[in-house]
């Protein structure tokens, strides 16, 4: 029996006031519908039907490379009509799980509980109890058994008092679902084909109807405008921050941390305020991350420190390495054990060896730097000739004086010393001292120019 997931994603989202389809608006740097797709995969979906309509080109440009069956809903005539568009892709023996592209916080554990609650060939619906159920379809029960769902606009006064509401998420048997969808009518206040009407049909057919509920109501909330989108973002971030704290991270203020990807943390990690963590990030034990730092797709070793306002992107910090404040590690940069870069140092496609240091104001690109090297302030690896990039190699225990330019390709041998202000254009042998400064001149009797008076 295959698990066939149908995701409804055809709506425009007029209240978003955006040309972007509603389901492509992001939560934690990932579209709402992508969150739903990922959750569908995590519960073991065998196939995913994406019902689309508005903004087809934008949807396909964002999601097109994934294993999805694209199902067009040319007219938006209700949720029942939307699901019916996928009928040709639903097998009689399938379990059909219906999800929504604008409900991004639904948890895999909740869906697993829903699927587990479904009896053989039965219908399972996800419900939630709300103190204020205004606007939602109500779950109608008789003798505690579900017999139907009535929408807000069609509900009687007695039914409006019900606080158990329909989330729209359900699991149904494929054969019966297709039959029920074929019987839907638009004879209602909205003039639409309600998916919820299949519940009464299931009851009439004697099908067992069971329910499950999410751990939190926020899981089943959608976003129809940007205020609701922001509320979902905050809920996502609160949940992500809680997960980090349970895994061993100390958060200076959980409300001032943005997590936009998959983060793994070790024990006794300290994260200060206004940090952004994006993509796949691995953080070791006893790591300190300063205020305002940005970490993107990077690996941080044990006992490392990222000082305030540093950016680490597609880069690695080894054990006890440190960066910042105001340092930038660009893609391909790596600090080996106990290496350090300080304020306003930028690295790209470069390795700084064990115990080596670049304290401040340097650019290190396309470079291999050995152990115990000192890079003085203002040092630049001149790696680009206008057409191609070239490599700078600095071997162990080299001292590079301040304001030195290394014109690649060039190799500096072990233990060499480069005098401050030098421009190095050829290889330097092991142990050599190289100075390329112009000889200093002393001009006595020289008078500084005097400014002309303003007219």
UniProtKB/Swiss-Prot annotation:
Documented EC number(s): 2.7.7.23, 2.3.1.157
Cofactor note: Binds 1 Mg(2+) ion per subunit.
Cofactor field: Mg(2+)
Region (N-acetyltransferase): 248-455
Pathway: Nucleotide-sugar biosynthesis; UDP-N-acetyl-alpha-D-glucosamine biosynthesis; N-acetyl-alpha-D-glucosamine 1-phosphate from alpha-D-glucosamine 6-phosphate (route II): step 2/2; Nucleotide-sugar biosynthesis; UDP-N-acetyl-alpha-D-glucosamine biosynthesis; UDP-N-acetyl-alpha-D-glucosamine from N-acetyl-alpha-D-glucosamine 1-phosphate: step 1/1; Bacterial outer membrane biogenesis; LPS lipid A biosynthesis
Residues binding UDP-N-acetyl-alpha-D-glucosamine, per UniProt: 8-11, 22, 73, 78-79, 100-102, 137, 151, 166, 224, 330, 348, 363, 374
GO cellular component: cytoplasm; membrane
Pfam families: Hexapep (PF00132), NTP_transf_3 (PF12804)
Active-site residues annotated for this sequence: 360
Gene Ontology MF, one: glucosamine-1-phosphate N-acetyltransferase activity
Gene Ontology biological-process entries: cell morphogenesis; cell wall organization; lipid A biosynthetic process; peptidoglycan biosynthetic process; regulation of cell shape; UDP-N-acetylglucosamine biosynthetic process
UniProt subcellular location: Cytoplasm
Reactions the enzyme catalyzes: alpha-D-glucosamine 1-phosphate + acetyl-CoA = N-acetyl-alpha-D-glucosamine 1-phosphate + CoA + H(+); N-acetyl-alpha-D-glucosamine 1-phosphate + UTP + H(+) = UDP-N-acetyl-alpha-D-glucosamine + diphosphate
Keyword terms: Acyltransferase, Cell shape, Cell wall biogenesis/degradation, Cytoplasm, Magnesium, Metal-binding, Multifunctional enzyme, Nucleotidyltransferase, Peptidoglycan synthesis, Repeat, Transferase
Residue segments, region Linker: 227-247
HAMAP family, per database record: GlmU
Family per similarity comment: In the N-terminal section; belongs to the N-acetylglucosamine-1-phosphate uridyltransferase family. In the C-terminal section; belongs to the transferase hexapeptide repeat family.
Oligomeric form and interacting partners: Homotrimer.
PANTHER family, per the entry: BIFUNCTIONAL PROTEIN GLMU, NUCLEOTIDYL TRANSFERASE
Known function: Catalyzes the last two sequential reactions in the de novo biosynthetic pathway for UDP-N-acetylglucosamine (UDP-GlcNAc). The C-terminal domain catalyzes the transfer of acetyl group from acetyl coenzyme A to glucosamine-1-phosphate (GlcN-1-P) to produce N-acetylglucosamine-1-phosphate (GlcNAc-1-P), which is converted into UDP-GlcNAc by the transfer of uridine 5-monophosphate (from uridine 5-triphosphate), a reaction catalyzed by the N-terminal domain.
Protein name according to UniProt: Bifunctional protein GlmU
Provenance organism: Shewanella sediminis (strain HAW-EB3)
